[in-house]
């Protein structure tokens, strides 16, 4: 998350610096300035209407995630094995020599899995392996972004550069719904689930006690705001065609895109056996979305079990720090670091409304 905030700050500084630099550039000549004055058409002297144009594009993208279910606590540990194809549809308009806006709709999938990503022999990742959580989240995003080209083109689209790097910043709303596969049974009570293996929504279950009213958290919303920012480069391939490569991060205002944020809660507070089973999966004999066998020899060499009496009067046996809110190291996720997701895209776009002069009759 610190890396994301750093890139966000750099994007802001680049926008301010580039805008200021362009504003201070001297005119080409007195002759050019006189020519501009004779063509005055309004307040935007530098980029009149006949130079502006609109464009539409389609992208193949990949969404990746960094959060509580990443292999380690740094963004470079993002597991690219969970990259899944998605798409983006976009429409924009260039209205200055080096700035333009874009509205876009993106769809893609985020995934995370402790069993596959966390190495039980790694001292940093072994507790994630014990935790044994996983999720899948389909993202639908609507974004409005402002883009700044780092190379100015004061001419029409026909004279745009062959390569143009750019940075962008904007606002977005996205819909999400984290899901996980249902286990065979609740390891605490032996309750058998008829829909074992199905993907079910985690938000209604309140896996961190959101539905109990006893913890300082509320059910998270499935529609959330975000701040998209990033950079890209555009290659001109024909008079009206461009291809672009872009990477953008989404700064989020919550920490539940993976349904993991705070600590474990008292398992005796759950009335729903499904919610209890999804809250603490550390003792399941299989791991991850693919339900592969786990190595308990490694787990027992790392931690030991602990039994406590829950709020419902039943006894629950958990690993130390997993499932009991009485344990000092009872951490399910890191509430201090918000999740982020990253969209990497390859876009093909076409200029659809170039200005065309009409012949005037005398």
What are these regions (language model features)?
Residues 48-55, 59-90:
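Surface-exposed strand-loop-strand hairpins of Gram-negative outer-membrane beta-barrel proteins
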Residues 43-44, 72-81, 127-135, 154-155, ...:
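Extracellular loop and loop/strand-boundary signature of outer-membrane beta-barrel proteins
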Residues 99, 105-195:
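Gram-negative (and chloroplast) outer-membrane scaffold detector with strong preference
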Residues 27-28, 147, 337-362:
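Outer-membrane beta-barrel "beta-signal"
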Residues 58-60, 89-93, 144-150, 169-173, ...:
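Residues on the lipid-exposed face of transmembrane beta-strands in outer-membrane beta-barrel proteins
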Residues 21-55, 155-162, 311, 327-331, ...:
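Outer-membrane beta-barrel biogenesis signature
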Residues 52, 81-85, 138-142, 163, ...:
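Residues that define the transmembrane beta-barrel architecture of outer-membrane proteins
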Residues 65-66, 98-101, 153-155, 240-243, ...:
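Repeated loop/turn-to-beta-strand initiation elements of outer-membrane beta-barrel proteins
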